[in-house]
């Protein structure tokens, strides 16, 4: 559990450095964009990606929205690189299997071509919730100007503590 939190923290630091602009002593000419407009566009892309998963299924949507080669997916049990590898586990998704998420915040670079969104996700099988947690998705504009996922990481919430029912004598059971 701790290594994944450390990995997520490291990604946030890298993103913060990337979004802070050029380093001291580096002469980089970047036309500044409105970071809020960039973030709004990335949040909209994230919502459209979630809608595509609901409409087209995870495999088709992941192939369409993840960058074909420069993308990575990290969760507690896997590290996958490239859209094909990331979409492959969804090849035979059983009926009733769904993944959904809602972005709630993010940050964007001043260059206007990179942003990270984060929010809550849920994985379900029919009415049964299999996993919920937080996700972080990093987006980069491709050569055509379309937003593509380059990094996606999830951290599941810890399981709820077991509930106990007192016995008739009032002792915890």
Residue spans for each PLM region:
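Short beta-strand edge/turn micro-motifs at domain boundaries
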Residues: 21-27, 132-160
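Bacterial N-terminal signal peptides
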Residues: 8-18
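Short, low-complexity N-terminal intrinsically disordered segments enriched in polar/charged residues
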Residues: 19-60, 64, 160-173
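A solvent-exposed, acidic/Ser-Thr-rich amphipathic alpha-helical stretch
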Residues: 40, 57-110
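Short, structured motif recognition centered on aromatic/hydrophobic residues
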Residues: 49, 101, 114-118, 138-139, ...
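A short, structured loop/turn motif at beta-sheet edges
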Residues: 106-114, 126-128, 140-146
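Hydrophobic/aromatic beta-strand elements that line small-molecule binding cavities or substrate pockets
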Residues: 86, 90, 103-108, 119-123, ...
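Bacterial N-terminal signal peptides that target proteins for export
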Residues: 1-8
């Amino acid at each position: 559990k701790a290594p994944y939190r450390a990995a997520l923290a490291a990604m946030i630091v890298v993103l913060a450095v990337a979004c802070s602009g050029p380093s001291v002593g580096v002469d980089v000419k970047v036309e500044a964009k409105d970071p809020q407009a960039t973030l709004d566009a990335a949040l909209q892309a994230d919502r459209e990606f979630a809608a595509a998963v609901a409409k087209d299924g995870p495999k088709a949507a992941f192939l369409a929205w993840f960058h074909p080669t420069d993308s990575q997916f990290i969760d507690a049990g896997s590290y996958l690189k490239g859209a094909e590898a990331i979409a492959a586990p969804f090849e035979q998704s059983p009926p009733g299997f769904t993944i959904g998420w809602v972005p709630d915040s993010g940050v964007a670079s001043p260059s206007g071509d990179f942003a990270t969104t984060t929010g809550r996700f849920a994985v379900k099988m029919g009415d049964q919730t299999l996993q919920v947690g937080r996700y972080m998705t990093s987006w980069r504009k491709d050569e055509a100007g379309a937003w593509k996922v380059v990094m996606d990481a999830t951290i599941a919430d810890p399981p709820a503590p077991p509930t106990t029912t007192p016995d008739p004598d009032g002792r915890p059971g």
